[in-house]
């Protein structure tokens, strides 16, 4: 599906969402590595910092509501697969919303499999897949960037538990503590770039 086609499909669904006639969620997985995330550092002298090994990972499969910015998550410490997506679908179905639900998600194989599509059909949830290589069209990518900035950059956590708690706490407060900061970031506008020649010297 081309970008022009997906935008034509998204536009009426956004209009319904803003009118309260539909719930549109953007879905994506983020893999937070328990390692060093430096901000900006430059100096003549060598500088040693405390840093975790980077061998542990906190996986978050999230669904971000396009209007309220509520985040529904499924988390684990192994990997995200089709069963994780099915768990998320069941969580969304359990919300008991009185309007149709549309999920906007990328073309990851585990999100397009027969199991996921069967569960979505059973729950009456529409799956709207984005074209390949178009993270700019996935609203939730902006949230992941915000979470990394808030919780990871230039931060050191003594243990993995504190690391995961910081991420969960940030996601829990998208509608409260972080509401003002996210207000301008999570707006329903998208960037797309035409093909352009790269200039080299």
Which residues fall in each region the model found?
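Short functional hotspots at interaction and active-site rims
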Residues: 1-201
